[in-house]
């Protein structure tokens, strides 16, 4: 069975205060393509015998959300507007959490999920006549926490896996 593209969901916590309940924004409206660029750091070495070996040194993932059409009704809009227009660069405005969910079986209520700290950084502001755009890039940071997520009305609830 081949999973449909909508099986991979990406949420950003727009409650950047660091306290209280997460307020998850589902990334994807008006976006036709969204991928996690894993940014694999791969080194290939060839020895004097002509043999090749590969070293995987790690990942530097990023996610480009382009286009994002500025919409004051979107929970993520105030965060993007503050960063783009006030040029803020601090953790209070840019650092938050992301949640990736894979829906492998729509009949199940809990789905594999991973939560991770991240930075949400606008790339530009402006665009063409189709509307004001603030494309942004999500930069994951630190370790991921695996678990499950239940989703109701496009709002996830994350439960970490037991250790």
Tell where the protein language model's regions lie, with residue ranges.
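Solvent-exposed edge beta-strands and adjacent loop segments
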Residues: 1-72, 119-130
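Extracellular/virion structural assembly segments
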Residues: 2-3, 49-115, 146-154
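Protruding loop/beta-arch "assembly-hinge" segments enriched in small, turn-prone residues
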Residues: 135, 139-163
């Amino acid at each position: 069975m081949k999973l449909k593209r909508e099986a991979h969901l990406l949420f950003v916590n727009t409650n950047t205060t660091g306290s209280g309940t997460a307020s998850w924004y589902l990334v994807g409206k008006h976006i036709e393509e969204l991928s996690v660029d894993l940014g694999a750091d791969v080194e290939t070495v060839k020895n004097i015998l002509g043999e090749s070996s590969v070293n995987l040194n790690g990942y530097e993932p990023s996610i480009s959300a382009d286009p994002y059409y500025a919409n004051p009704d979107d929970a993520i809009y105030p965060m993007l507007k503050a960063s783009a227009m006030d040029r803020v660069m601090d953790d209070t405005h840019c650092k938050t959490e992301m949640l990736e969910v894979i829906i492998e079986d729509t009949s199940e209520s809990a789905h594999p999920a991973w939560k991770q700290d991240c930075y949400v950084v606008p790339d530009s502001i402006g665009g063409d006549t189709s509307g004001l755009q603030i494309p942004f890039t999500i930069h994951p940071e630190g370790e991921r926490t695996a678990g499950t997520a239940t989703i109701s009305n496009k709002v996830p609830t994350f439960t970490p896996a037991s250790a």
